[in-house]
Amino acid sequence: MLKVDNVGKTYKKGGLFSSERQNVLKNISFECKSGECLGIIGESGSGKSTLGRLLVGIEKPDYGRVLFDGKNVEDRKVRQGRISAVFQDYKSSINPFYTVEEAILEPLKLQNKSNTENKDKVVKLLNQVGLPESYRNKYTHELSGGEIQRVCIARAVSTEPECIVLDEAISSLDVSVQMQVLDLLKDLKKIYNMSYVFITHDIQAAAYICDRMMIFKDGQIEEIVNVEHLRDVQSVYARKLLQSLITF
């Protein structure tokens, strides 16, 4: 379904007039299957968030292609309504002048639905993410971090996408809230039969929600492994990264 084909990305290194470039992603190839949760695990600076931006078409690769059902995600029509994203910084993800209802409805503006249909959908989505209907007219400054992220998840789900990219989506939340959001994501995945790309540095969270893990290091894939076979990882780096979770 979502296929990354020999993708690379560089950024300019040094001053304005420097011609030197830094390799951030190098020859990345993998697939996220329909209905699965694929974890992309790596330390800060490994390039995993850059990869996330390529998956949703925010940035373009220097070479290679990101395909969704065989079509390039650089074409907005390919990803519109079919690929959504939830990012780490939930506070800047929603326009502070929007009510919760306006924020959730933002991706639906092109769908020619009636006001009644849209309002009914907002109520349904709020219920699914564990927020009361009364939150429709609230603004984000009135909500807790966990509540704002639930609104972001409701917005991402609103178009009933086939795939959601979750880039450190729980890392800014209190530990007590993280598990609640993970359980919510699991439930929504079943309801809508979606795929997730779960980008994180949190090994335990990834092991809880993912079907497969892709270990990322220095802009390259170190190893891909099924979660039930984590003990069988071959890479020395992968074993080191998983030490907090598994005794080898």
Where are these regions (language model features)?
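Conserved catalytic motifs of ABC-family nucleotide-binding domains
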Residues: 160
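Conserved ABC ATPase signature
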Residues: 139-143, 147
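Conserved ABC transporter NBD signature motif
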Residues: 64-75, 79
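C-terminal boundary and immediately downstream tail of ABC-type ATPase nucleotide-binding domains
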Residues: 129, 216-218, 224, 228-248
